[in-house]
């Protein structure tokens, strides 16, 4: 085998490596990237700011947010919905005014045609000795094909006038949805549904700055086991305490009583937290990011 035959450009088969390389270099095809540990947030970090929470709150689906960040997000979404609703109302009023103008013009044209018909008198006396074909020879109406061609010509677009081109259509604004949705789960989100979370620090004497710099920051509120990205955790709704799922299964579910506040618990009061990423594929976290791009089809 010659040296030229060992090059990757000499093969007759389009290999998988060449396909991935061309997909990354071109602007077509869905791009897929395997995320590392550095690209996944920790279990106690906000889903919006990706920073450790100072005043954490959790949704019913287990997504943790910084209270200030999620309230600012909800306020921004409500302002955007109000702006879209204002544009929709403006379009609706403009369309209504246009329909009123058209109805008014149609009524005026009908009234004018009726008045013209009533006020018109016969200018030529009818001659009983002439045939209809002779009298109507001078005022012959155009045939049906000519009328249809003229009407079709009026409806054809003028490509040299921007307002009459087929693409020059005003984009209609759809009625916006007034519901604010969670940025992670996509479900409806309300401020009253946010539950405060109270983490139990490893050392109560360490301030917040020193706590953030440590790798192991929080422990279970009941068993004092260390919490981390690889440990399944849950939030108890009445007290907001964070405990491990092992504690929930072995201790709390026997009596269904909150060990911190003493309130009666239900199944919906035990909210499982969405865990952070460990970098391993078996951690239960989606470690693959996709970017949808145009696809070339033959």
Curated annotation (Swiss-Prot):
A motif (Nuclear localization signal) lies at residues 78-101. It comes from the Eukaryota. Its EC number is 2.3.2.27. One of its GO terms (molecular function) is ubiquitin protein ligase activity. Keywords: Cytoplasm, Developmental protein, Nucleus, Transferase, Ubl conjugation pathway. One of its GO terms (cellular component) is cytoplasm. It is an enzyme of class 2 (transferase). InterPro entries: NOSIP, Znf-NOSIP, Znf_RING/FYVE/PHD. CDD domains: RING-Ubox1_NOSIP, RING-Ubox2_NOSIP. The keyword NAD does not apply. It catalyses: S-ubiquitinyl-[E2 ubiquitin-conjugating enzyme]-L-cysteine + [acceptor protein]-L-lysine = [E2 ubiquitin-conjugating enzyme]-L-cysteine + N(6)-ubiquitinyl-[acceptor protein]-L-lysine. It is found in: Cytoplasm; Nucleus. Residues 126-157 are annotated as: Disordered. Belongs to the NOSIP family. E3 ubiquitin-protein ligase that is essential for proper development of the forebrain, the eye, and the face. Negatively regulates nitric oxide production by inducing nitric oxide synthase translocation to actin cytoskeleton and inhibiting its enzymatic activity. This is Nitric oxide synthase-interacting protein. It comes from Xenopus tropicalis. The gene is nosip.
